[in-house]
Regions:
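Short, well-ordered alpha-helices that flank and scaffold nucleotide-derived cofactor binding pockets
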Residues: 41, 45, 78, 105-109
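Conserved HGGG/HGGXW glycine-rich cap/lid loop of the alpha/beta-hydrolase fold
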Residues: 6-61, 65
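Active-site loop/oxyanion-hole signature of alpha/beta-hydrolase fold enzymes
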Residues: 50-92
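Flexible "cap/lid" loop of the alpha/beta hydrolase fold
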Residues: 101-106, 111-142
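Gly/Ala-rich beta-loop-alpha elbow adjacent to hydrolase catalytic centers
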Residues: 92, 96, 100
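Structural signature of beta-strand start/N-cap positions in the alpha/beta core
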Residues: 21, 48, 86-89, 110-113
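Short, flexible active-site-adjacent loop segments at beta-strand->alpha-helix junctions, enriched
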Residues: 28-29, 94, 120-121
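Conserved alpha/beta-hydrolase catalytic His-Asp/Glu region
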Residues: 142-168
């Protein structure tokens, strides 16, 4: 399995394709074990796509403490440095877009282009402790857990009042 040992943790990553490098930073709950993912789409036909499990998710290390947005951004920089990539196009989706912004602010010389999808500015607060989500959840249980975390329109109160909406 492809791991990179950075200064702070072991990061699981996968890459596919050739040509100009693109760093793909996934959203809440992103895990490269989920298929299909960005590596199965058309992007690797035109780029060298690097995707990784962020700290606390998938097969990347899960330090047992809150994570800062600066750490997430630095993880991306350390991964690229370990791969010998000096400059990259970055695609950040949802929470990954927040991470991409922190990466771009902290490491501007590494970013050639920045594409932000379905995201917000985020902030400097620690992220949700994704490493505390059990790995053995059923797909439905995982969905319900992630909805409560990522969709502020559907918090626990809303879920309790609209159980029929969640059964779809």
């Amino acid at each position: 399995m492809p791991y990179i040992a950075t200064k702070h943790l072991n990061i699981y990553f996968e890459e596919k394709g050739d040509d100009a490098p693109v760093l793909f930073i996934s959203g809440t709950g992103g895990d490269l074990r989920q298929r299909p993912n960005v590596l199965d789409g058309p992007l690797p036909k035109h780029h060298r796509v690097i995707a990784y499990d962020q700290r606390g998710l998938g097969r990347t290390e899960k330090p047992d403490r809150p994570y800062t947005m600066d750490e997430y951004g630095n993880d991306a920089a350390e991964l690229l440095a370990a791969l010998g990539i000096e400059q990259v196009d970055v695609i950040g989706v949802s929470f990954g877009g927040m991470v991409a912004q922190h990466f771009a602010i902290r490491h501007p010389s590494m970013v050639r282009k920045l594409v932000l999808c379905c995201t917000s500015p985020g902030g400097d607060m620690p992220s949700y402790p994704f490493h505390l989500i059990p790995e053995d959840l059923t797909p439905k249980e995982r969905f319900l857990t992630l909805v409560g975390i990522s969709d502020t329109r559907r918090d626990q109160e809303w879920q309790a009042e609209h159980p029929q909406q969640l059964r779809r």
